[in-house]
Swiss-Prot record:
<dbReference type="GO" id="GO:0010951">
    <property type="term" value="P:negative regulation of endopeptidase activity"/>
</dbReference>
<dbReference type="Pfam" id="PF00228">
    <property type="entry name" value="Bowman-Birk_leg"/>
</dbReference>
<dbReference type="GO" id="GO:0004867">
    <property type="term" value="F:serine-type endopeptidase inhibitor activity"/>
</dbReference>
<dbReference type="InterPro" id="IPR000877">
    <property type="entry name" value="Prot_inh_BBI"/>
</dbReference>
<feature type="site" description="Reactive bond for trypsin">
    <location>
        <begin position="16"/>
        <end position="17"/>
    </location>
</feature>
<keyword id="KW-0722">Serine protease inhibitor</keyword>
<protein>
    <recommendedName>
        <fullName>Bowman-Birk type proteinase inhibitor 2</fullName>
    </recommendedName>
</protein>
<dbReference type="InterPro" id="IPR035995">
    <property type="entry name" value="Bowman-Birk_prot_inh"/>
</dbReference>
<dbReference type="GO" id="GO:0005576">
    <property type="term" value="C:extracellular region"/>
</dbReference>
<keyword id="KW-0646">Protease inhibitor</keyword>
<comment type="function">
    <text>Inhibits trypsin (IC(50)=24.3 nM) and, to a lesser extent, alpha-chymotrypsin (IC(50)=0.51 uM).</text>
</comment>
<keyword id="KW-1015">Disulfide bond</keyword>
<feature type="disulfide bond">
    <location>
        <begin position="14"/>
        <end position="22"/>
    </location>
</feature>
<comment type="similarity">
    <text>Belongs to the Bowman-Birk serine protease inhibitor family.</text>
</comment>
<feature type="disulfide bond">
    <location>
        <begin position="9"/>
        <end position="24"/>
    </location>
</feature>
């Protein structure tokens, strides 16, 4: 599937890079 596009965390900001990198900050990631 689109696992590559889903690489970003749901609660994290995703950079518009290719491949997109997950900028995980403390946003309820418990």
């Amino acid at each position: 599937g689109d696992d590559v596009k889903s690489a970003c965390c749901d609660t994290c900001l995703c950079t518009k890079s290719n491949p997109p990198t997950c900028r995980c900050v403390d946003v309820g990631e418990t």
